[in-house]
């Protein structure tokens, strides 16, 4: 048995299962915190993932509804709650995901009250040799954000990717990815621009790389990122490198973070294969 993906909404999961049944592929749903979709015939995994990518692009396509009618599951027979916004956040995010989100919000509020420079004096990458033993600085630069759009964009991705890693692989794995990527992406960025930078984007890019490659090489890990999203990440890096949008971007942190995530995913998936 191979787990293909998970859906928060069991009706959506049932729609995909019904459609694959019309294609001659039998999937099953197991209800845990979410609706986990499992495949018995692992030889069909690549085909199922390709169909899943198309399904996720437009789950409301009439062909999927038609498949549910054909299978007789338009009512799904499943009972599920309608989650309000904060309940949906809580459903996907583990404790580490929440702690980092709250820390970023608290730091952002402090920056609005005290000013960016005052907070950066305490949290920025060491900007003076006398500060090199203030070890928190090698990580806390990731908590600082300089605009509402900056923090919303990063926290949305952090919640989506970090939450998935924590739920599937544990809090320890998320902590390791976060600390290593914050340290190395910060080191590279300060070589590019000096110590005055901030943001969680280096960690977010590490999570993008990790989730995508781990899902490709080790589907049984239960994490997955559409190829379209990793292509978007690469386009965003290129746009930032050539300053196509006229915005200040931490290009060094983005590239380093992505490289860290890919490297960690390669090692972890290699170890997972050896254990089989």
From Swiss-Prot:
Cite the EC number. Answer: 3.4.21.105
Q: Which UniProt keywords apply?
A: Cell inner membrane, Cell membrane, Hydrolase, Membrane, Protease, Serine protease, Transmembrane, Transmembrane helix
Q: How does it sit in the membrane?
A: Multi-pass membrane protein
Q: Any keyword Phosphoprotein?
A: no
Biological process per Gene Ontology, one example term: proteolysis
The UniProt entry's sequence similarity note says: Belongs to the peptidase S54 family.
- What function does the entry list? Rhomboid-type serine protease that catalyzes intramembrane proteolysis.
Protein's name according to its UniProt entry: Rhomboid protease GlpG
Native organism: Shigella boydii serotype 4 (strain Sb227)
Lineage of the species this protein comes from? Bacteria, Pseudomonadati, Pseudomonadota, Gammaproteobacteria, Enterobacterales
